[in-house]
Amino acid sequence: MVDFAFELRKAQDTGKIVMGARKSIQYAKMGGAKLIIVARNARPDIKEDIEYYARLSGIPVYEFEGTSVELGTLLGRPHTVSALAVVDPGESRILALGGKE
């Protein structure tokens, strides 16, 4: 079992993540992400776009069970984060959430 909060912080510290729905959609379109994480309460149109483009690019999508406020807090940000793209997992095992590792 992967501890989401721990692995997310590890990916943030040792790898590369890109925060924000717009950037996550761009990475889904380009196929540049290894995993996309979407908050449970993200707007439906954002979820649909991310899922559509990620499916075309073969990128797994993980739905975070918390809200965008909680996701932002986990990342140490003072704002909401509705989606993020994991470009490089670094030393984390975050990709296990998407079934890849």
Curated annotation (Swiss-Prot):
Keyword Cell membrane included in the entry's annotation: no
SUPFAM superfamilies: L30e-like
InterPro entries recorded: Ribosomal_eL30, Ribosomal_eL30-like, Ribosomal_eL30-like_sf, Ribosomal_eL30_CS, Ribosomal_eL8/eL30/eS12/Gad45
GO molecular function: RNA binding; structural constituent of ribosome
GO biological process: translation
Pfam family, one: Ribosomal_L7Ae
Gene3D superfamilies on file: 3.30.1330.30
A GO CC term attached to the entry: cytosolic large ribosomal subunit
Entry keyword set: Ribonucleoprotein, Ribosomal protein
Cited HAMAP family: Ribosomal_eL30 (MF_00481)
Family statement: Belongs to the eukaryotic ribosomal protein eL30 family.
NCBIfam families registered for this protein in UniProt: PRK01018.1
Protein name stated in the entry: Large ribosomal subunit protein eL30
